[in-house]
């Protein structure tokens, strides 16, 4: 349309990087669930009012799906779509994504759902040391 190729898509990930895979999974699950619960409550996304509000019917349809699948499955799906784990697990996740959509820009969120600052910083530093250099080499 604009006479040039579209830039890579921007992908946002709620990220938790740790050397211990089980610990990374447990932390990501706990804090993503906390984040998602606050999001649902703040925006009242589980109610049926959105489907009746002009301009918000799309959100109403999403809320209907959320009510149908339940909070646990919502968290599972959200968790599956974000990158967390050991540095290698994260690279594997990013590689699988790259194989599907090609190049992408990455916006990472290391602090969400009440993760303590120290843990978020440790996760970010490990990601910067062991994941980011490899991601940069793909560009």
Regions found by a protein language model. Give the residues of each.
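An alpha-helical appendage that flanks or caps ligand/catalytic pockets
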Residues: 1-103, 136-139
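Outer-membrane beta-barrel pore domains
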Residues: 78-86, 108-110, 115-119
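C-terminal helical cap(s) of enzyme catalytic domains, especially alpha/beta-barrels
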Residues: 116-136
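Intrinsic disorder/low-structure terminal segments
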Residues: 55-58, 111, 126
């Amino acid at each position: 349309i604009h006479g040039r190729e579209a830039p890579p898509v921007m992908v946002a990930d709620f990220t938790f990087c740790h050397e211990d895979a089980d610990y990374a999974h447990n932390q990501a699950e706990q804090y993503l669930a906390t984040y998602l619960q606050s999001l649902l409550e703040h925006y009242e996304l589980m109610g049926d009012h959105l489907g009746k509000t002009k301009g918000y019917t799309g959100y109403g349809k999403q809320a209907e799906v959320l009510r149908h699948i339940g909070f646990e499955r919502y968290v599972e799906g959200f968790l599956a779509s974000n990158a967390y784990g050991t540095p290698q697990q994260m690279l594997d996740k990013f590689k699988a994504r790259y194989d599907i959509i090609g190049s992408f820009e990455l916006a990472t969120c290391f602090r969400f759902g009440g993760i303590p600052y120290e843990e978020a910083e440790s996760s970010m530093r490990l990601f910067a040391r062991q994941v980011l250099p490899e991601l940069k080499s793909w560009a």
